[in-house]
């Protein structure tokens, strides 16, 4: 399940791609399959181990070109261990909302992005997220949870303050918003479990009907907002 549109970001074979806050690697995998030189970064040793295992499986299955590469690095997004201007593309998907000092993480993203390079930054969208916060304290108050809700304009301002220029916006995962509202309101009921099964089925099978429905609903109900930015050359 990808939040970032790779065609819109312009990820191509041979590019260096940094996936910040990679989790278990979902965005790193797609860049790897496209032939990029991928570096996936996270603080979780467990998630990085999973990322390495899946990248190895992708290579073994022949799903990545032989000249592509993938590495997983444990690092703090506020102090990245890379030189300035290192990466053609940077992805930060659903991570900034977890970081109290997001300004430092954004500054590091901008620092390691090459001049003329592009980045995609995704966060939970304001309205669906506000509903979740209103329905459940546990949703955001647990350790490592969400510490803020962004408006798209606010996130754009923060990225531009770091020297980046917003070049596009998108929304994703409209079918996931009602699931999280149900889960926040009712926790693990039969309805919530059934909805979760529907989402898993949709992710695996990607039927035309649900793909069309989500694409149509994304502008209104998209769970995530995606900002595409560019570092001036």
Please state what every model-predicted region is:
Residues 1-83, 89-93, 103-106, 147, ...:
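Conserved N-terminal segment of class I S-adenosyl-L-methionine
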Residues 124-148, 157:
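Short, glycine-/aromatic-enriched active-site segment of Class I SAM-dependent methyltransferases
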Residues 147-162, 169:
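Short alpha-helix
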Residues 103-118:
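A short glycine-rich, Lys/Arg-flanked "PGG" loop and its adjoining helix->strand segment in the class I
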Residues 122-124, 172:
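Alpha/beta-hydrolase-fold catalytic nucleophile elbow
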Residues 94-98:
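A short His-aromatic
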Residues 168-205, 223-224:
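Conserved catalytic loop of SAM-dependent methyltransferase domains
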Residues 38, 119-120:
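A short hydrophobic/small-residue beta-strand
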């Amino acid at each position: 399940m990808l939040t970032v549109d790779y065609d819109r970001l312009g990820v191509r074979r041979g590019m260096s791609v940094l996936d910040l806050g990679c989790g278990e690697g979902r965005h790193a995998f797609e860049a790897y399959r496209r032939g990029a030189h991928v570096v996936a970064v996270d603080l979780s040793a467990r998630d990085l181990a999973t990322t390495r295992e899946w990248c190895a499986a992708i290579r073994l299955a022949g799903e990545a070109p032989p000249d592509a590469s993938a590495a997983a690095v444990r690092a703090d997004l506020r102090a990245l261990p890379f030189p300035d201007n290192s990466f053609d593309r940077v992805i930060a998907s659903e991570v900034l909302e977890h970081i109290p000092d997001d300004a430092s993480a954004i500054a590091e993203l901008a620092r390691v992005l090459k001049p003329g390079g592009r980045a995609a930054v995704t966060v939970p969208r304001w309205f669906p997220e506000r509903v979740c916060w209103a329905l459940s304290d546990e949703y955001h108050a647990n350790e490592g949870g969400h510490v803020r809700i962004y408006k798209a304009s606010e996130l754009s301002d923060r990225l531009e303050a770091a020297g980046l220029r917003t070049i596009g916006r998108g929304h994703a995962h409209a079918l996931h918003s009602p699931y999280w509202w149900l889960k926040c309101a009712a926790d693990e009921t039969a309805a919530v479990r059934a909805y979760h099964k529907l989402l898993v089925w949709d992710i695996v099978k990607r039927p035309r009907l649900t793909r069309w429905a989500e694409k149509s609903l994304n502008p209104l109900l998209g769970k995530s907002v995606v900002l595409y930015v560019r570092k001036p050359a």
